Swiss-Prot record:
Signal sequence, start to end: 1-20
GO molecular function, one term: phospholipase A2 activity
Record-linked SUPFAM superfamilies: Phospholipase A2, PLA2 (SSF48619)
Binding site for Ca(2+): 58, 60, 63, 83
UniProt-annotated location(s): Secreted; Golgi apparatus; Cytoplasmic vesicle; Nucleus
Name of the protein described by the UniProt record: Phospholipase A2-alpha
Disulfide pattern: 38-66, 42-72, 47-122, 59-79, 78-105, 85-98
Length: 148
């Protein structure tokens, strides 16, 4: 039952202009934005809220490190690799290959109990759980839409 709800939410989310979601968001918290940004600092905010999640420099919706920026830790490196994979697939966020590689990378990070970056306020396993839910929805949507 949860999978269809997540899939519907995922498809609905990607069918709405992201800028439309930004309406009123800054009124609630001025640091929240859904515009494409690049980061030069390691962040850890909104750890359990997928649309606003900011982890490291590369983890988060429409959020990525600036060109040439090194990832903050192993989990952030997984996000950086996912960003690069999606970009190499003409920004196809439903790419089965990119989503599966990302999930595998995060699982590997978690299993090895790698350290997180200094100053991190998020529980890495919670961040992985949140991102994994979104990626599982992307995998389902990609299968439905027959994405490679």
């Amino acid at each position: 039952m949860a999978a269809p709800i997540i899939l519907f939410s995922f498809l609905l989310f990607f069918s709405v202009s992201v800028s439309a979601l930004n309406v009123g968001v800054q009124l609630i918290h001025p640091s929240i934005s859904l515009t494409k940004e690049c980061s030069r600092k390691c962040e850890s905010e909104f750890c359990s809220v997928p649309p606003f999640l900011r982890y490291g420099k590369y983890c988060g919706l429409l959020y990525s490190g600036c060109p040439g920026e090194r990832p903050c830790d192993g989990l952030d490196s997984c996000c950086m690799k996912h960003d690069a994979c999606v970009q190499s697939k003409n920004n196809d966020y439903l790419s089965q290959e990119c989503s599966q590689k990302f999930i595998n990378c995060m699982n590997n990070f978690s299993q090895k109990k790698q350290p997180t970056f200094k100053g991190n306020k998020c529980d890495a396993d919670e961040v992985i759980d949140v991102i994994s839910i979104v990626m599982e929805a992307a995998l389902i949507a990609g299968k439905v839409l027959k994405k490679p």
